[in-house]
């Protein structure tokens, strides 16, 4: 049987990425051009800057992916692209590039939801067993998703305000840490103790919603008041206390979801899934359900995860027309229960 190759494009935020998937789950290449250095001085992603960077490097990423995989454009059977959620200008660059490649080679165009991509990144780690529960944690999203079968998603809980990754970056900025702050906070937390009392919003309530704005505000107020009084705060203990509160919230809601929905496994994915503290808590706290987490290289935004999600859509012949457009606030295919 002839091998099938899907080329995937990801440009929803500040990473330009092109990957090539062989058959169902073999990633041949996953080119990522990061813009982190360009956005550090702003303390966050500037949409217009991100879009311009995508334009500058996307063509090179295409060629690098083909070269690294040892393939020609004519070998590609389909093109997948993230069409939301994300920054509209950034998304449009990837969509335009994917359309051009698909049109030039007369091959199908596969639309992929960015968050479905994060979830399906776990496919490279292990074959997924349905039904499953997914905890998706990133800079823009915090969601619990029930997945009864491949390609069907039901959001059963989400954040009411800040995403968990956003909270990390905001408190990191207050402490003067470099953007993005998640990794540094995680490292500092492992050197400190949970000595500061931060709130765990809605942790005892039965619903599956998250909230991190109160925790973020409590952290900022504590830091501000200490500065006003000239008090010294222990940075490592601050990070340890903040992270302990975050993880308590995430684990409490995840356990409630697993109790309500019988599943075969728990997938934890998204940029925050790279957090070592989270991985340690999952290993110690979730013992009756198999936990699957993508490898570190597939936790952040990348086209490899888009390709892995696209393979499922390809089998369903879920192709887009040439009128495919960016949807910045794109939701999962199913309505929230």
Curated annotation (Swiss-Prot):
Gene3D superfamilies (UniProt xref): 3.30.420.40
One Gene Ontology MF term: iron ion binding
Signal sequence region: none
One GO process term, biological-process aspect: tRNA threonylcarbamoyladenosine modification
Cofactor(s) required for function per UniProt: Fe(2+)
Enzyme Commission (EC) number: 2.3.1.234
Subcellular location: Cytoplasm
Stored InterPro entries: ATPase_NBD (IPR043129), Gcp-like_dom (IPR000905), KAE1/TsaD (IPR017861), TsaD (IPR022450)
Listed GO CC annotations: cytoplasm
Catalytic activity: L-threonylcarbamoyladenylate + adenosine(37) in tRNA = N(6)-L-threonylcarbamoyladenosine(37) in tRNA + AMP + H(+)
Cofactor binding comment, as recorded: Binds 1 Fe(2+) ion per subunit.
HAMAP family: TsaD
Name listed for the protein in its UniProt record: tRNA N6-adenosine threonylcarbamoyltransferase
Source species of the chain: Streptococcus uberis (strain ATCC BAA-854 / 0140J)
